[in-house]
Amino acid sequence: MTPRFVPLSDVAEMLSISASQAYALVRSGELRAIKIGGRGQWRVEVTELESYIQRSYEATAHILEEEREQERQKASRDR
């Protein structure tokens, strides 16, 4: 059975980022998470992580499209 929630440390490992970077994503609101238990362990719902990854793909595609457009404009000016 696939878990519904994963610890923030697992999120960091899955995204190949540090634990502090994963926590920064939560603090900024980019990645939704909840605190569970007496020690306040952060957990991220797997569907939230998947949504974050999808949004990151879309943002990257937008950045790349802007870069391509800038290159086309530069090439037009250089002619």
Regions found by a protein language model. Give the residues of each.
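Basic Lys/Arg-rich amphipathic helical interaction modules
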Residues: 1-24, 46-79
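Major-groove DNA-recognition helix of helix-turn-helix-type DNA-binding domains
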Residues: 15-42
